[in-house]
Amino acid sequence: MPQPINISASRAAALLGQSEYQTPVSVWLQIMEARDPGFCARRGYILPVIEYTPAMRWGHAFESAIVELASAEKGTPITDREKFFATSGAGEYSRTPELSLERGHFLTCHIDGLYIGDDPPSLHEGKTTSEFYYHTHFGDPGTDKVPPEYQIQCQHQMICTGAERVILSVLVFPKRVEEWEEMGYIPVKSENGVWRIDNEKFINAIDPIEWARTLAEMGFFHQYEIHAHPELQSKMLTRYREFWEVNVLGAREPEPQSMDDIKCLCPSPVGTVVADESIERMLYERESIKSEISASGALGKRVEQIKVATLDYMRNAGAVIDDESKDKWLLLSRDGRKLASYYRDKRGYYIFR
């Protein structure tokens, strides 16, 4: 599927530092490659691979089912499914990709649907999740207590459409979708676009709407109301414009935030670099705490931050290739001691030590 060339709703959380799956660098690389095919190859970057995960597959399979449940819950038809909207945040909107390009509207979204009859209009947004994730990340139904990335996605859609409310409908599965697939339940899309759930143990496929209705009867369907938040939207627009003008139009890399960012921006690290005082201090800090931590804790995240900051420094410091660093990055202290190295081993794994 072609990637959007603008800031879409699914990318919004990444630009605000609220995504578990994307970073500003990965979003930037996707946008730049979509706008200018071959951009990554010319710059020596690697385009991030977007994996079609089981969560995505199940989400797509149950989209229509959630629309039916949401429409029945409110007693209002839902229309304009997958309708395109775009804006630059100045109160003018486009409803086709062609018009958005003509007007320079760089914020886009495809809505899941629009409730007929609401004035001002209310948007429909559907989600699927597991029972464990639901109970650890959502608040009481009827409130706006949803994960930050969903809140941001809804605010983005309201920016793009001018709507003032999103009804977020959540279908909860008692198990993770990976567990359902391990049990043999696989969502399959037919040639005419109709989804079904196949299982080789059964003769007939399962219609997602029948499954969804059963879950709803068991209390696994919930709705949340997300209202337009002008202050948050203003901050989002400020960040969007900075990213668009500096990073996209200016073709400047965002600051890397993860080891995956470093791998994409510099897939073939070579050369020797001399650390400055701040990098030396960070590496000493890393050595002092890494033996006492777990990777998931606050100190573990700090160690990861130090690694990323060190490698970003090495990437921009003007490395000199010598006999010892012709196949790796080598970081030396100001007095010539070896502080760290970074290289790709024979299996293709990147090693920092």
Task: Describe the function of each predicted region.
Residues M1-R353:
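Accessory terminal regions of nucleic-acid processing enzymes
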